[in-house]
Amino acid sequence: MKTLLLTLVVVTIVCLDFGYARTCLKTPEVKSEPCPPGQEVCYTKAWRDRMCSFRGKVIELGCAATCPRQEPGKEITCCSTDDCNTHP
């Protein structure tokens, strides 16, 4: 009986994924990092600033609890799988 109980406990621990965290690419390093608890959405924000003609669009990558709101002049895309917010 104890062996059966121990087996069930081991199987439960192996099957459950304790501590899983979504991973998203984050700037400025454009590096995959785990998101804080509760943040399951990866996002990409792109916009033009005064230096755009020299360096191109400003890109921000990160994690959020929900997709950030659209803002005038900013392109925002969201996804919900690991490292899905690739650098454009």
UniProtKB/Swiss-Prot annotation:
The keyword Translocase does not apply. One of its GO terms (molecular function) is ion channel regulator activity. It comes from the Eukaryota. Residues 1-21 form the signal peptide. It is found in: Secreted. Keywords: Acetylcholine receptor inhibiting toxin, Disulfide bond, Ion channel impairing toxin, Neurotoxin, Postsynaptic neurotoxin, Secreted, Signal, Toxin. Disulfide bonds join C24-C42, C35-C63, C67-C78, C79-C84. InterPro entries: Snake_3FTx (IPR003571), Snake_toxin-like_sf (IPR045860), Snake_toxin_con_site (IPR018354), Toxin_cobra-type (IPR054131). GO terms for cellular component: extracellular region. Expressed by the venom gland. Pfam families: Toxin_cobra-type. The keyword Nucleotidyltransferase does not apply. Binds with high affinity to muscular nicotinic acetylcholine receptors (nAChRs), whereas it binds with a low affinity to neuronal alpha-7/CHRNA7 nAChRs. Has the length of long neurotoxins, but only 4 disulfide bonds, as short neurotoxins. Belongs to the three-finger toxin family. Long-chain subfamily. Type II alpha-neurotoxin sub-subfamily. This is Long neurotoxin LNTX-2. It comes from Demansia vestigiata. The lineage of its organism: Eukaryota, Metazoa, Chordata, Craniata, Vertebrata.
